Amino acid sequence: MAGLTVRDPAVDRSLRSVFVGNIPYEATEEQLKDIFSEVGPVVSFRLVYDRETGKPKGYGFCEYQDQETALSAMRNLNGREFSGRALRVDNAASEKNKEELKSLGTGAPVIESPYGETISPEDAPESISKAVASLPPEQMFELMKQMKLCVQNSPQEARNMLLQNPQLAYALLQAQVVMRIVDPEIALKILHRQTNIPTLIAGNPQPVHGAGPGSGSNVSMNQQNPQAPQAQSLGGMHVNGAPPLMQASMQGGVPAPGQIPAAVTGPGPGSLAPGGGMQAQVGMPGSGPVSMERGQVPMQDPRAAMQRGSLPANVPTPRGLLGDAPNDPRGGTLLSVTGEVEPRGYLGPPHQGPPMHHVPGHESRGPPPHELRGGPLPEPRPLMAEPRGPMLDQRGPPLDGRGGRDPRGIDARGMEARAMEARGLDARGLEARAMEARAMEARAMEARAMEARAMEVRGMEARGMDTRGPVPGPRGPIPSGMQGPSPINMGAVVPQGSRQVPVMQGTGLQGASIQGGSQPGGFSPGQNQVTPQDHEKAALIMQVLQLTADQIAMLPPEQRQSILILKEQIQKSTGAP
């Protein structure tokens, strides 16, 4: 026995025990103990029972005091008949009895790995997907809900847990795909994208899950990190199938509404729209109503190709609000920009009207301005942009010329004297309220309305025109086709049929000097309610004001004469040199 004590207790016990199989189910441990006592004293006899049913499994273990007795039992009792069955007595340590040996040695059930069976890395994704797919919808939803709470209440612990158990993070992402919280393509990008997971997750895990119904938790952990970076690259990525809202906030790095001011100053985290310059603004609108100052800046940015400085009076702005005229898919009309913004809910509400939309409307109505005018025409775009800036401004409380100076020099309220002065033009004639008329409203801009107005105004509206800036006008005769709904009709494009420059209609702008007695729809400076015609006029005036001497010289004689007359009238009425 001295030698036995040196050995491991479990090994020693196994050597002193025998495995007994093929035991009748009705047999008791006492009956079996009596049988095995025939070869020597029995220390213990244990039947193995099923854990779930509690019924005997048909085998057990008999422990003797020494190994010799155990060997004797195997020789003499193997095949012994009991209740019609031949007992099988074997070495407890034999290969086929390992499971029973473990139970015997430890005296406790075998502990299964909490991670389940071992799987090779390449097979892990498929295995996890199957496991997730096997979950009933209710359980999957509950899992997401619990994970979301975990992330919200203990972000750091949740982060560590997911980092330590990547298979769980993958399973959560897979579950989101199954629940349609995340688009499969986005999920793939997230998986294969290097992101600063710790920072993103730790920072604010909840935003992403919010996207999903009950999920979110996993999204925050797995996707969230990737999503923020992805948003910019993906642009349209709907994280989580996601709620475009999430994307909007994440995409383009567009910050919360409050942050818009910063966005306005710069080009915008990421231009979401193809337009380019304009796009920056589009992203900004996400913020919601913007104060006049902000509104002005955005408008300017697009025209200046995102540059904040005021445009030099002598430098033509080749690109429209949207960016490069030729490349701009939208045709460089404000509408495209507006269209982009509208989804975010930015431009619409603040404008109180279709200010930006008016251009969009045009877009749908006719070919992009570029097409109508031809190569040179893109330049007129800036004209549109100009009116637009002021219009946006109008959304907020009117700003005085100083506070609201647009790069264009347009005052938030309208063409206030100071804004005009910035351009070297006296804006007194164009009063802020005229601008308030929200000339920006797209509907007012309709080409047809404009044509009609242009006809009425003929030379009278010339007054409203100011030589505001070097906005390039049509380089050559404007095609009569331009009269159409083309957004650019407003300024440079004057239908030949209605030779009067539609721009002239701008007289509607109520500058005291600008009002045209014949102008229908003209309103007093004090008027707060603006009619579409007023908007139209304001926009036209803006365009005309931007024509340079060279551009005017390129116009047909009648149009050129009308514009010159307008300029003279404006100068006289405003006292400008």
UniProtKB/Swiss-Prot annotation:
Function, in words: One of the multiple factors required for polyadenylation and 3'-end cleavage of mammalian pre-mRNAs. This subunit is directly involved in the binding to pre-mRNAs.
Region (12 X 5 AA tandem repeats of M-E-A-R-[AG]): 410-469
Keywords noted in UniProt: Isopeptide bond, Methylation, mRNA processing, Nucleus, Phosphoprotein, Repeat, RNA-binding, Ubl conjugation
Region span, Interaction with RPO2TC1: 514-577
GO biological process: one example: mRNA 3'-end processing
CDD domains for this protein: RRM_CSTF2_CSTF2T (cd12671)
Record-linked Pfam families: CSTF2_hinge, CSTF_C, RRM_1
Organism: Pongo abelii
Residue ranges of the region described as Interactions with CSTF3 and SYMPK: 108-248
Domain of life: Eukaryota
Location of the RRM domain: 16-94
Subcellular location: Nucleus
Protein name, per record: Cleavage stimulation factor subunit 2
Lineage, broadest ranks: Eukaryota, Metazoa, Chordata, Craniata, Vertebrata
Gene Ontology terms: cellular component: cleavage body; mRNA cleavage and polyadenylation specificity factor complex; nucleus
Modification sites for Omega-N-methylarginine: 308, 468, 475
Primary localization class, coarse: nucleus
Cross-link annotation Glycyl lysine isopeptide (Lys-Gly) (interchain with G-Cter in SUMO2), location: 189
Modified residues (Phosphoserine): 14, 518, 524
